[in-house]
């Protein structure tokens, strides 16, 4: 299958990457999402909890300054340590505009509302169609 080349791809600096930082405490589910995104051409950094997610975001922000990487976060809402909502709140308090897509097995309206209030680009309830998440990542990924 031929990969469609977009203007975004051709504008990228030679060393730049399209990076997704994926935080999900279910190892098998995290692996499934990662494989779908990697087939789409994204580099995926996996984190098993919110603390590892926050550390990965800090690293990506530092590298982005040097290499002009484009990246976003996909995070489970309920994880050990810091939740996806906690990490999103920390990023927004630090004036970090990194796009965040949230996923959750506990998708009540209050959870969705809290995610939207904090600036989540999207909130997906588990189980969801991984192709819908893939589409959301494509639409949400910042330009180079």
How should each PLM-predicted stretch be described?
Residues 49, 83-86:
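Acidic catalytic/metal-coordinating carboxylates
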Residues 80:
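The feature encodes the CheY-like receiver
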Residues 85-96:
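Short amphipathic alpha-helix used as the core "switch/output" element in two-component signaling
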Residues 86, 107-122, 135:
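Alpha4 helix (beta4-alpha4-beta5 surface) of REC/receiver domains from two-component response regulators
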Residues 126:
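A Lys-centered signature of the CheY-like receiver
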Residues 46-72:
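Acidic, metal-coordinating helix/loop segments flanking the phosphotransfer/catalytic sites
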Residues 1-21, 27, 31-34, 40, ...:
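Non-catalytic signal-transmission and effector/linker regions of two-component phosphorelay proteins
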């Amino acid at each position: 299958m031929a990969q469609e080349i977009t203007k975004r791809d051709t504008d990228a600096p030679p060393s730049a990457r399209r990076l997704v930082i994926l935080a999900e405490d279910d190892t098998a589910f995290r692996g499934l999402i990662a494989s779908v995104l990697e087939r789409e051409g994204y580099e995926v950094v996996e984190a098993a909890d919110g603390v590892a997610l926050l550390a990965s975001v800090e690293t990506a922000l530092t590298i982005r300054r040097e290499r002009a990487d484009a990246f976003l976060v996909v995070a489970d809402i309920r994880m050990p340590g810091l939740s996806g909502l906690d990490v999103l709140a920390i990023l927004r308090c630090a004036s970090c505009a990194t796009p965040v897509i949230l996923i959750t097995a506990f998708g009540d309206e209050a959870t969705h509302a809290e995610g939207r209030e904090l600036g989540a680009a999207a909130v997906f309830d588990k189980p969801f169609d991984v192709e819908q998440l893939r589409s959301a990542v494509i639409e949400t990924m910042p330009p180079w």
